[in-house]
Design a protein with these regions (language model features):
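Catalytic-site microenvironment of enzymes
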Residues: 1-244
Length: 244
């Protein structure tokens, strides 16, 4: 009789422990979601700038595919990766449109377009501005993705180095982040980088940039670089998985 009672007590103890552990495992995902670090990420704004747009097609490959369309496609994919991690993302354009329409008799459209992008970054109070572009060269063998920064902005440089490190993981010839004198990067009030995602003058690279899966890999690398560069006061989560 005593043996039966002891076995029953042990069974009840085991059942209680199993119930408690099961409850903790069930609640763990919900407990994790309320960690303040994610809410801090939600307070971090990144401005993505798909270069060109509308009447400004940018450069193009030999088949006539325009830079503006590639820039926009990759920017949308970067936004998806960052928002998945809780980052607030603003884009200078979400469709094929220019930010400074052509006005007959008035010059300086390009500068007005850049100024409009800068103002959007400032009004959004963005921590980083990441401008996406494609490159072109008279040397058809030139290729590679490069992140540019303003040499007087250490925060922008750190962001460019972080992005470049991730880009080098997916390109055959590693490149170095480089300083550049660009009107967009020299403006005060935000930390900007320009990411050239490849040369449309290079046949192989141009073909890759037309592929959605390759665009996804580029976007993932840039998003990873942005997340790694965030201040240490914010969490650094990663998107769910790297593209195959």
């Amino acid at each position: 009789m005593r043996i039966i009672i002891l076995r029953k007590e042990r069974f009840l103890l085991f059942l209680s422990l199993f119930t408690v552990l099961g409850g903790l495992l069930f609640l763990f995902p919900f407990l994790y979601r309320v960690i303040p670090a994610r809410s801090r990420l939600g307070q971090t704004t990144i401005l993505l700038d798909p270069g060109h747009g509308g009447i400004d097609g940018g450069t193009q490959d030999r088949a006539g595919n325009l830079e503006k369309d590639i820039n926009l496609a990759i920017a949308h994919k970067i936004r998806a990766q960052l928002t998945q991690c809780g980052v607030n993302v603003v884009m200078t354009r979400e469709e094929d449109t220019e930010l400074a329409p052509y006005q007959p008799g008035r010059g300086g459209r390009h500068r007005r377009d850049l100024t409009a992008r800068i103002e959007r970054a400032r009004s959004a109070k963005a921590l980083y501005l990441v401008s996406i572009h494609c490159d072109w060269s008279t040397a058809a063998t030139r290729r590679g993705m490069v992140a540019f920064y303003y040499y007087r902005n250490p925060v922008g440089k750190n962001l460019a180095l972080s992005i470049q490190e991730e880009l080098n993981k997916i390109q055959p010839q590693p490149q170095k982040a480089a300083p550049g004198k660009y009107f967009l990067l020299e403006q005060p009030g935000f930390n900007g980088v320009i990411v050239e995602v490849g040369f449309l003058s290079h046949p192989e690279e141009a073909a890759l940039l037309q592929q959605a899966d390759y665009q996804e890999k580029v976007a993932f690398a840039i998003a990873q670089g942005i997340l790694r560069a965030l201040p240490t006061t914010a969490a650094h989560p990663s998107p769910a998985s790297s593209p195959p």
